[in-house]
C-alpha cells in the first residue's frame, strides 16, 4: 500500500504582509484605549493620594495654625526634636511636605507621589534624615502659597486650592499651566474645604474652577479675592 504525503504549504509573502497589516491595524485601534486606561489609573491614584495629603494637611493646620510655612520650621524642630529636620525655607513642595513628615503627622512619603512627567517613581519611605526625605522625583503635587511665600490657613475661602497636579513640565515648569496629556485634560486638586476634585484643563493648559473662572484668576468674584496672589510652589523634578 502506497502512502501519499502531502507537503504543508508555507505562508506566501503576500499572506504574511496581510497578517502584519491586520496586526498593525488592531494595535492602532487598541493603543489609544490602553493609554486612556493608564491615564485614568494614574488620575485615580492622584485622587486617592491627594485625599491622604488633605487629612495630614488639616491635622497640621489644627496643630500649628496654618498649612506648611517657612516660619514653622523651627517650631516643629523644637516641639518634635526628631532626626528629620523640618525646613525653614519652602522653595519646593518637597520642603512643604517634609514639614508634615518632620511633625510626625504624615507617616508615609508615598501619599505625596502621583505619576507625572516630573515624578516617575514612588518614594522609598526612607525619611529619617532630611537628605533622605522626599528626594527629586518623589513628589507629584504642587503646593499653593499666598503673597510673600506665606501659607494659607483653613479660614480662607473654601474654594481655594491647596495642592494640584499634574503641572506642565518640559525641562522646566510652565507657570499656571497643567499637563493636558497626563490625565486626559483633568487636573486633580485639593481644596481648602478638604475636598478633592478633578478640574477640566482648557486648551491653554489652565485649570477651570467653574464657568469661566480659572484657578489662578484674581480679584472680585474669584476664590482668591482682592490682594491675594496665589503662587504655585513646584516639586523638585526627577
Q: Predicted regions span which residues?
A:
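Short catalytic/ligand-binding loop motif for oxyanion handling, primarily in non-cytosolic enzymes
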Residues: 61-62, 67-70, 75-78, 119-126, ...
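Structural recognition of the beta-strand scaffold that forms the well-ordered cores
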Residues: 61, 68-69, 111-115, 161-163, ...
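Acidic, glycine-rich loop-and-strand cores that form catalytic or ligand-binding grooves
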Residues: 102-171
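Conserved hydrophobic/amphipathic alpha-helical signal-anchor segments
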Residues: 28, 32-93
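C-terminal accessory segments of extracellular proteins
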Residues: 169-238
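Surface-exposed intrinsically disordered loops and tails
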Residues: 74-91, 124-149, 207-237
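Amphipathic alpha-helical segments typified by the pilin-like N-terminal helix
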Residues: 2-48
